[in-house]
Amino acid sequence: MIVYFSGTGNSRFAAEFLSKQLNDELLDTGRHMKAGEKDTLHSDRPWVFVAPIYAWRMANVLADYIRSAELTGSKDAYFVLTCGGEIGNAGQYAAQLCKEIGLNYKGVLEVVMPENYITMFNAPGEEESRAIVAKAKPVLEQGGELIRKGKDLPAHKVGLLDKLKSGPINEGFYKFYVKADAFLATDA
């Protein structure tokens, strides 16, 4: 089962792409999160969790959802993380999550998509966005093939800066910048 959270559509695109490639069931957690539901999910096939990177880690809302859900059936878990540039050391945190809830971590796939965190970064234009998505498709295809075969995704090379970004810098971003609060636009 492909379980995803998407804030702006990049992760939804990746999840739908993989769902078609793998002929696997798709679950949009957004509706479930809004309803405050604690889900019981079953999959005989590997779990594929798809989410955006928020400050070099998987979005906390999906990690929290995964922790709260009762997952039965398969014990294998893959993570497909969409980002504007890179995922830092997000794989380590996904592996820790798997250990916490009793799943077998099968790796993380970094999928570069158009930047959309416009409060801090510039979004690319339409032509550049199309080129970025075109480059993401073969990455998704290759990752999907490994998932289909039950193989681990290739290890993501992690350096000291990646550890800092996904560790203390992530915590600072969440404290000061990453907000999911509702916002309002006025004519003022």
Regions found by a protein language model. Name each.
Residues 1-2, 6-14, 20-33, 37-51, ...:
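FMN-binding flavodoxin-like domain, especially the glycine-rich phosphate-binding loop
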Residues 181-188:
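Cysteine-centered iron-sulfur cluster-binding motifs in ferredoxin-type domains/subunits
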